[in-house]
């Protein structure tokens, strides 16, 4: 009987690997070049966000949400402020809702541009990130013009948004959409028909519908399996039920499908943005952008100069903060990476008793072993790129 040398390797992927999307360490067990087991070691970016939020007032806890999925910060803020508003029973004025939806969709573009182009870079294409980041830069400037910050915005507040948008900014966002769609078409023509990109992504990381549900997938990962599950349609929040848009779904549930869905989602986001811009410039041109309940939303500076009550409200809000009625609430939004949920438990004080953040990337990373098993080592990077992971939210 001939002697066969079986070469079993254990290798470390990361935590400083350029394709690891942050501080991910994966211990891979290989048989030759075939992956037999993947063990993701997470927690290298753990900052104790949930516990920190429990020591702060509701207003002070807001900025922590920006630091989770820092690619699309306002989408995480959205879930938190909706949860606080649900506890308080506060209604956000229509103009405030439209501004929130507009910036949530800008966040979706920011996220998908980064993911699609870096997914291409992970398999060897170097041009897409340069093209994609040019568009991201323009969107970052919209963030900056709305609230002064490019990344950690803290723009969504309980009761509405921090400040109104100037009309010229809304017009500029409207003028951005058509050139963006042209640029997206160029990116599409560059990557989608590319032979090498297809060979690296088609039939890689396939997952069935039942497996996807069982593993807690959401967002693009579940839609890739052919399920039209999108919280903006199935459990509408804000004014998404008044918007016209389609939900792209996949057929083969592989990495290539997930890429195609993200590309189409960007077009749908642009469609939603256009509807928001049109309404903000016509029917909802005037009106408040946040609730007028001064016990929750701080009064305007001009009001404080001649009203003692306004001054008192302002002082109380920024020292003690508002109290929420006791109870518990779970609110989920369709973040770019999937279902981002915030579970709040209130004990009637000015601070949350317990905050639980449900990060979509956390559930998706746990499936890495299942998705990669039996594939080649080089496919692990393609699969990791397609599940869209940011470590701020995975490790929290």
From Swiss-Prot:
Main location, first listed in the record: membrane
Keywords: Cell inner membrane, Cell membrane, Membrane, NAD, Quinone, Translocase, Transport, Ubiquinone
Stored Gene3D superfamilies: Cytochrome-c3 Hydrogenase, chain B (1.10.645.10)
Topology relative to the membrane: Peripheral membrane protein
EC number(s) given by UniProt: 7.1.1.-
MF terms in GO: NAD binding; NADH:ubiquinone reductase (non-electrogenic) activity; quinone binding
InterPro entries: NADH_Q_OxRdtase_suD, NADH_UbQ_OxRdtase_49kDa_CS, NDH1_su_D/H, NiFe-Hase_large
Listed GO CC annotations: plasma membrane
Catalysed reaction equations from the record: a quinone + NADH + 5 H(+)(in) = a quinol + NAD(+) + 4 H(+)(out)
Enzyme class per UniProt: translocase
Cellular localisation: Cell inner membrane
Function: NDH-1 shuttles electrons from NADH, via FMN and iron-sulfur (Fe-S) centers, to quinones in the respiratory chain. The immediate electron acceptor for the enzyme in this species is believed to be ubiquinone. Couples the redox reaction to proton translocation (for every two electrons transferred, four hydrogen ions are translocated across the cytoplasmic membrane), and thus conserves the redox energy in a proton gradient.
Quaternary structure note: NDH-1 is composed of 14 different subunits. Subunits NuoB, C, D, E, F, and G constitute the peripheral sector of the complex.
Family: Belongs to the complex I 49 kDa subunit family.
Protein name in UniProt: NADH-quinone oxidoreductase subunit D
């Amino acid at each position: 009987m001939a002697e066969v040398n079986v070469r079993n390797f254990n290798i470390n992927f990361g935590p400083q690997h350029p394709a690891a999307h942050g501080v991910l360490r994966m211990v891979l067990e290989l048989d030759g070049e075939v992956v037999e087991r993947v063990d993701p070691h997470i927690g290298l970016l753990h900052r104790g966000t949930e516990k920190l939020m429990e020591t702060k007032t509701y207003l002070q806890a807001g900025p922590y949400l920006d630091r989770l999925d820092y690619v699309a910060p306002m989408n995480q803020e959205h879930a938190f402020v909706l949860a606080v508003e649900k506890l308080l029973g506060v209604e956000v004025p229509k103009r405030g809702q439209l501004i929130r939806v507009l910036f949530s969709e800008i966040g979706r573009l920011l996220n998908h541009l980064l993911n699609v182009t870096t997914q291409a870079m992970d398999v060897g294409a170097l041009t897409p990130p340069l093209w994609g980041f040019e568009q991201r830069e323009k969107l970052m400037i919209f963030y900056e013009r709305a609230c002064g910050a490019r990344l950690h915005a803290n723009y969504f507040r309980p009761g509405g948004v921090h400040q109104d948008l100037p009309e010229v900014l809304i017009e500029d966002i409207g003028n951005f959409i058509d050139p963006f769609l042209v640029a997206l078409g160029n990116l599409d023509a560059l990557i989608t028909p590319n032979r090498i990109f297809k060979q690296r992504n088609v039939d890689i990381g396939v997952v069935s519908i039942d497996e996807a549900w069982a593993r807690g997938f959401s967002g693009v990962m579940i839609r890739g399996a052919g399920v039209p599950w999108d919280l903006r349609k199935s459990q509408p929040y804000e004014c998404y039920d008044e918007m016209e848009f389609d939900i792209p779904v996949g057929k083969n549930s592989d990495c290539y499908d997930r890429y195609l869905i993200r590309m189409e989602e960007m077009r749908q986001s642009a469609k939603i943005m256009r509807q928001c811009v049109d309404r903000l410039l016509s029917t909802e041109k005037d009106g408040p952008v946040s609730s007028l309940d001064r016990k929750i939303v701080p009064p305007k500076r001009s009001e404080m100069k001649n009203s003692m009550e306004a001054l008192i409200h302002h002082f109380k809000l920024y020292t003690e903060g508002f109290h929420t009625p006791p109870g518990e609430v779970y609110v989920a939004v369709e973040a770019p990476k999937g279902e981002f949920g915030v579970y709040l438990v209130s004990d009637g004080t000015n601070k949350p008793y317990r905050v639980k953040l449900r990060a979509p990337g956390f559930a998706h990373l746990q499936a890495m072993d299942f998705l990669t098993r039996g594939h080649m080592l080089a496919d692990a990077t393609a699969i990791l790129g397609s599940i869209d992971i940011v470590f701020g939210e995975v490790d929290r």
